[in-house]
Every structure is written in structure tokens, then in C-alpha cells.
Amino acid sequence: EHAITALEHLRAFASPLGVKLLVENLQGDVATPAHLLEILNVGHLDSIGVCLDVGHANLADGVPAAIAELKDRIRSTHLHDNKGDRDAHLWPGDGTIQWDDAMQELRGAPQTPAGVLEIHYTLGETGDSVAEKAKRAFEKF
């Protein structure tokens, strides 16, 4: 109930400014895909979309399950990998996420979501090395 009220207030403030609100899935009970959809549906918050955090989905019920459940509401994605044990924010391909399968599922979404690489900085990386890794990551998609 508190989440619905908070989102209603945010929507009322954001809408006149042309700002689109998104909620993000998290690992844990509070923001699972099922719970996010329940909040959005019960609150009739049809204008609020979802930012699918692929790494968080990998730590919960899995990426394919999250995409299947949220597919109609996904407007953006946070793209990072992990090994299923912690929110490591690794480069895509450096963890256990099956990216080919995930991207195939996302291609079936009604809208093509924006993709944001959400990667932890590694000490000593240069702008050039980060750009090269980002290029390789987006080639997967």
C-alpha cells in the first residue's frame, strides 16, 4: 500500500514534466518481478514501466523467468553479469548469464528497451580499455 501511494505521488509530480517512471527488480522479496507487477497492477499504475536489471534477475529466479514475467512493461535494462552469488556488476560474458538466451527473450518484448551497461570500475582501466569492453559487450546484443 505504501509503495502504491509513493508511486502515485511520484507519477503526479513526474507526468507534467514528461518524465517516465520506471521501477527496478531487485533480488529479495520486496521487488521481485511478481511483486512489482502486483504493485503496478493493483495500483492501476499503467504509465509506470520496468527497468529490468539482468544481474539482479540472475540472483533471483533467473533471467528468462524475469523477462517472461515483465516483458510487457520493460522499458530499460541494466546490463551486467554475475556468477549467481553476489551483485558483482561484471562485464556481460564474465559471469553465468546466458546472454544469447536473454537477448532472444528480450527481442520478443513489445518495445525494444534501452540498454545501460552497469559495470563496476576496475582500478587501472583506461577510457580506451573501457570503450573496447563496452563495444564487445554491445556486440553480444
Q: Where are the predicted features?
A:
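Active-site acidic/histidine proton-transfer and metal-coordination neighborhood
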Residues: E1-G49, L59
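Alpha-helical packing segments of well-folded alpha/beta enzyme cores
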Residues: A3-A6, L10, A102, A134-F141
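Structural preference for beta-strand elements that scaffold enzyme active sites
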Residues: G18-L22, S47-C51, I74-H78, D85, ...
